Design a protein with these regions (language model features):
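Short glycine/proline-enriched loop/turn "hinge" motifs that connect secondary-structure elements
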Residues: 80, 168-174, 237-239
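Active-site metal-coordination/substrate-binding segment of hydrolases
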Residues: 65-129
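Buried hydrophobic positions in well-ordered alpha/beta secondary-structure cores of metabolic enzymes
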Residues: 23, 40, 56, 70-73, ...
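N-terminal helical capping/dimerization or prosegment-like subdomains
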Residues: 1-79, 241-245, 259-262
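Short glycine/proline-enriched coil/turn segments at helix->beta-strand junctions
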Residues: 41-45, 50-52, 64-65, 121-125, ...
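Acidic/histidine-rich catalytic neighborhood of metal-dependent amide-processing enzymes
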Residues: 109-176, 180
């Protein structure tokens, strides 16, 4: 069968509607992975599977050739209360498809799969691997990170995200801190106790106001945001513990370890990093693929996420 753009678009849209209909929250992607794996196998491709990661190789895979990875993720964030309609019911309105994960990153999942299937119909000078991975939204260790060591060497990767077809050539790193202040419980009506909430106020203000010196041309400054806070059990008890979470997005001029060491110099509360492994990454703007994208009119940029 000869495939053209309208046919590929129709098939990708149909598949995307099916995926939207299957809830696939991070770490709960089994049903979506099962469906996608079956879909790929119905297209005549052999699949691999690890956890909820699904992949397939182009026919006549030759280790002497360079290998291009096509990757995007099947998991989504949880739907927020602002949804006015069922987030798992796909609907088309004014040429747009709505539903949880339709854009991030279902559109990339189905588009890259159509490209993979089309390119596999003829011989290429390179190998292709298509990988639909899980746990991207939570930076989970059971996502793509768990699969890559078992794949053949990758020469280049195209990762699908909603970038309006502009190439992201750099990405900020991520470090999440759990910060704790410890006080002493007491009755709110009496002059007793040591309020843990008051202990965090200066540190929270520091995270809000502090600016790291080094700014990246592509990624800008390091960004720190306090995103969660918890304290107290009831209105008349002075809380003896207050915790808050800080989301930190690093540029390539700092490692997460460097940032953590600097932060600890400025705050009084106890801080623990959940992980240091997600440092900033980038590809040289002079890379041939990046230069090809520029010649096509694309504008490289640095992604904050």
């Amino acid at each position: 069968m000869k495939y053209d753009i309208p046919t590929m678009t129709a098939e990708a849209t149909s598949l995307l509607k099916s995926l939207i209909s299957i809830p696939s929250l991070s770490r709960e992607e089994t049903q979506a992975a099962d469906f996608l794996q079956n879909y790929i196998e119905m297209e005549g491709m052999q699949t691999g599977r690890k956890g909820n990661n699904v992949w397939c190789f182009s026919p006549m895979f030759d280790l002497k050739k360079p290998t291009i990875l096509l990757n995007s993720h099947i998991d989504t964030v949880k739907p927020v209360n602002g949804w006015r309609k069922d987030p798992f019911t796909p609907r088309e309105e004014n040429g747009k498809l709505y539903g949880l994960g339709s854009n991030d990153a279902g559109a990339s999942v189905v588009s890259l799969l159509q490209v993979f299937l089309q390119l596999c119909r003829t011989s290429q000078r390179y190998n292709l691997i298509y990988l639909a991975s899980c746990e991207e939204e939570v930076s989970g260790k059971d996502g793509i990170e768990s699969v890559l060591p078992g794949l053949p060497p990758i020469s280049f990767a195209i990762v699908g995200e909603p970038t309006e077809m502009q190439p992201a050539i750099a990405e900020k790193g991520l470090m999440v801190l759990d910060v704790t202040a410890t006080g002493k419980a007491g009755h709110a009506a009496r002059n007793e106790g040591d309020n843990a909430i008051y202990k965090v106020l200066n540190d929270i203000a520091w995270f809000r106001d502090y600016r790291f010196d080094k700014e990246s041309q592509l990624l800008g400054p390091v960004k720190m945001s306090v995103t969660v806070i918890n304290a107290g059990t009831q209105h008349n008890v002075v809380p003896d513990k207050c915790t808050f979470v800080v989301d930190i997005r690093s540029n390539e001029l700092y490692s997460n370890e460097d940032l953590f060491a600097e932060i600890k110099k400025h705050i009084s509360c106890e801080a623990k990093a959940r992980s240091f492994r997600l440092n900033s990454s980038r590809i040289d703007e002079k890379h041939p693929f990046v230069q090809k994208a520029i010649k096509m009119g694309r504008i490289p940029f640095g992604s904050p996420t």
